[in-house]
Amino acid sequence: MSSRLNYFKIFDLGLGFMVISMIWAPYNAYMPIFLGNFTKSNTLIRFVMSWDNIANLFILPLFGALSDNTETRIGRRMPYILINMPLAGVLYALIPLRTKLLSLLVIDFLFNIVVATYRTPMVALMPDIVEEEHRSKANGVINFMGGLGSLIIVFVGSQLYKTNKAYPFFLSGILSLIIPIILFLTIKESKIVVNREKERQSILKLKHFIAVVKNQNKEPLLLWIL
């Protein structure tokens, strides 16, 4: 018998996806403006804005595979989230502070690399801690949190930008420092995975026992027919 879905943990995990949404909305809206302050080349601006897609082609599957084969006391996915998400947040907060094109390009390039290194482990964490029959519900909660993050940054971020162009980036950057700690404290990945594996092994043993009993009950009938 499967356990009930722990909505508290799913909402906590959804906070990570909320922050991801809060990162990309201001980035896509304001990064072209920042670049336009230093260059009038639309080709360069379009190229820089495509860095995340280029990075995703290589980094997402690479770090997905790396996290699959990672063995630590805190789990497989959590190390990437706990280390790389805050680092990405710091780089993200530095973007609007750059005063030269070269420094802006370097910080932006590093940000796109680092943020891609924790996205796949974040996505993979959900099926690791949620049973198969509950994953559609969990996915719905996570998508809701992502949408909520977009709404928050659209309404709040635009007002912050009017006050100071760096404030929307500071907000998402600060949350990128806080949320990984919350995830680490509330989602004990290694413990959940171990318990799920024990439960799976128990179910397999029970199914095997039932199959053996059924086969034993059939043997006298087969002998009588023979």
Regions from the language model: what does each represent?
Residues 35-36, 66-67, 71, 159-162:
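Interfacial helix-cap and linker-helix signal at transmembrane-aqueous boundaries
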Residues 167-185:
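Symmetry-related core transmembrane helices of the 12-TM Major Facilitator Superfamily/SLC fold
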